[in-house]
Amino acid sequence: LRFICQGFTVMPKHNYLLLSVLMLFVWVSADAFAKQSKPNILVVWGDDIGRSNISHFTHGLMGYKTPNIDRIAQEGMTFTDYYGEQSCTAGRSSFITGQSVFRTGLSKVGLPGAKEGMHEKDPTIAGLLKNHGYATGQFGKNHLGDQDKMLPTNHGFDEFLGNLYHLNAEEEPENEDYPKNKEFHEKYGPRGVIHSTANGKIEDTGPLTKKRMETIDDDTSDAAIKFIEKQAKEGKPWFVWWSGTRMHFRTHVKKELRGISGQDEYSDGMVEHDRHIGKFLDKLDELGIADNTLVFYSTDNGPHMNTWPDAAMTPFRGEKNTNWEGGWRVPAMVRWPGKIKSGSWSNEIMHHMDWLPTFLAAAGESDVKEKLLTGHKAIDRNYKVHLDGYNFLPYLTGKDEHGPRKEIFYFSDDGDLTALRYQDWKLIFMEQRAEATFQAWREPFIPLRIPLLENLRRDPYERALITSNTYDDWFLDRAYLLVPAQAYVATFLKTFKDYPPRQKAASFSLDKVMDMLTSNAGSR
């Protein structure tokens, strides 16, 4: 440009127009490059998948390989101490909002007809990225609310195609004892697969039947890829969250794929899920945008092992909906060529909540957490919330040696604080003693008068409480940790004074009904 401007004064007048056109081209190209320089963000999830089911962790121990998921890890960073939540809705809400489930009230598995769901006062990754010119699409399982106002397209996404519940709820209408009257189904039955857009269009494409479950991930991944192709053609940065229905139970694999794992139908579904991940990676390569796309793979929560053999596996104690690590630690890996070191492993503590501030930082807004404390506008809404996530971008890109997160607060689906992890230490305040079968969902968490103490570096699988003859002596010698832990929890709870919980967690028992009756009686 300097050369062009220097020559401008000696140019003949008839070349002024040519120069103007050239400078306009340079300006437009620079503007397009600036938009392109913002990374695309692709989030691909499974459902209820365990660490053992991914061959990157177990080298084929389960009898099959997952080469495409493994590729993300091999070309990026794998986490050993990564946390989801204890169940589906909790894991998804904490990811997309960057807030604790105790703050949003979205800790209980969402059921058809439930009133709880995404609230308009809570920002999302998608909505905040709109400020940076991103196209946003969500495809696959949502599980963040049953009503239209809770759909992703009312919370920052341009397009959504997917289902709203867990798979076993979707197939309930096919049960022989399911009520046949239309009124029951309209009030309590699952909605179909929804296709909606931000302009208010909502289409119910029909029920997610057992037969349709065989191909629903084909349909939603195809739609996601079509969305990506469109944005790539227009040179627009995009954020896509694809969340497959695999491997939530019950697994229904199409006939032509049965046997591809050499194991059982569940394993066939896992291999198929890996192929879906491969579709996305291949498309990024084909479009030539892989180097400018951050790819994150994970799942919502730990395995639902009480449905075995239609279930995932984990080396950690416990399973979904417990206070044990098996319900919380999930496989996680992230790839960003040239930014995140390939083949690296991280022992830092990280949680789903951390991606909101991290993705916003990658888009150029590293102070979104501070802005939201006082009020920040996005998608024509003014949000004022306390983010519980941390910005991991400096750590992921090698600028910082350690990640910013030191703690994990374990909330049950009822919204009770069951445990705290601080660095290597874990204190358990409420214990789920029914560790096996469906009783883990039915039986209550038991409050402890004195918490249990664990060191998750020396005993990551939480075996000492079961096997050690000298555990209590070891505990007593470290009782000095109890009071500081209480103080740490108190500091966290103080944040709720100015940023109180949005809603109370849903309940599967009569507790909420009784609360409503008591509230109504008191208002007379």
Model-found features: residue ranges?
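Formylglycine-dependent sulfatase
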Residues: 12-21, 30-447, 451, 460-524
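Short, Lys/Arg-enriched N-terminal segments with co-localized hydrophobic residues
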Residues: 1-10
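Compositionally biased, low-complexity intrinsically disordered regions
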Residues: 5, 21-23
